[in-house]
C-alpha cells in the first residue's frame, strides 16, 4: 500500500462490539470514504493491557490479522480526580457491575459527599495494518460529574458528565454535538486529518 493512495474506498474493520462506538466512528470518519465493516465472527482478545494504548492495540491487531484488513479500535475511560484517576482503563467493568446503569450508580456511591467532581474522558484510537504497523491517536475531554444522571442519549458514563463550557450532560446532546467535543471525536478528528491526503508517512521504514 503506497503513501498518497490511502484507504479511500477500501474496507476497514471496526474492532468493537459496542454499537454506540460504531455509530460515532462511522459518522466521524464519513469524510474519508472508507467502507467500515463490523467484526463478523472475529472474537476479540480480553482487554488485559495496563493502558488505553495497549488495550486498543490488542483489539486492532487481532482484527487486522484475522481479517487481513486495516482495523480500527478504540479504548477509552473516565478518570476521576477524587478517585485518583479511577476507573481509567477499568471503566467498562468498574466495580464488576454488569451494565452502564449499575456502573453509574456505583460511581455516584463512591463520590457520595465528595465536593471535587472534576473528571476527564480519555480516548485512544489505533489503526492497525495486517503487516503490524500501528497509528495512534489520542483525545481528551475535561468536565464535571453530576450528582445524578441526566439525559437519555449516549452510553457509558454520558448521563453523569458535563463537559467544560457546557450546561448539558453528554447524554442530553445529539450524536453530532457530542462528537464535536468528545474525547473520541477529537481522536478520530486527528485520524481523519492525518489521512485526508492519503496515508500518513510511517515513522519507521518497513523492509520487505
Curated annotation (Swiss-Prot):
InterPro entries: dITP/XTP_pyrophosphatase (IPR020922), ITPase-like_fam (IPR029001), RdgB/HAM1 (IPR002637)
Catalyzed chemical reaction(s): XTP + H2O = XMP + diphosphate + H(+); dITP + H2O = dIMP + diphosphate + H(+); ITP + H2O = IMP + diphosphate + H(+)
Domain of life: Bacteria
EC number assigned by the record: 3.6.1.66
Disulfide bridges in this chain: none
Keyword tRNA-binding: no
An annotated GO cellular component: cytosol
Enzyme class of the recorded protein, top EC level: hydrolase
Cofactors that this protein relies on: Mg(2+)
Pfam families in the record: Ham1p_like
Stored CDD domains: HAM1
Catalytic site positions: 75 (proton acceptor)
Cofactor note: Binds 1 Mg(2+) ion per subunit.
Binding-site positions, Mg(2+): 46, 75
Gene Ontology biological-process annotations: nucleotide metabolic process; purine nucleoside triphosphate catabolic process
Keywords per UniProt: Hydrolase, Magnesium, Metal-binding, Nucleotide metabolism, Nucleotide-binding
GO molecular function terms listed in the Swiss-Prot or TrEMBL record: dITP diphosphatase activity; ITP diphosphatase activity; metal ion binding; nucleotide binding; ribonucleoside triphosphate phosphatase activity; XTP diphosphatase activity
UniProt key word Transferase: no
Role played: Pyrophosphatase that catalyzes the hydrolysis of nucleoside triphosphates to their monophosphate derivatives, with a high preference for the non-canonical purine nucleotides XTP (xanthosine triphosphate), dITP (deoxyinosine triphosphate) and ITP. Seems to function as a house-cleaning enzyme that removes non-canonical purine nucleotides from the nucleotide pool, thus preventing their incorporation into DNA/RNA and avoiding chromosomal lesions.
Cited HAMAP family: Non_canon_purine_NTPase
PANTHER family linked: INOSINE TRIPHOSPHATE PYROPHOSPHATASE, INOSINE TRIPHOSPHATE PYROPHOSPHATASE/HAM1 PROTEIN
Protein family per UniProt: Belongs to the HAM1 NTPase family.
Complex formation: Homodimer.
Protein name: dITP/XTP pyrophosphatase
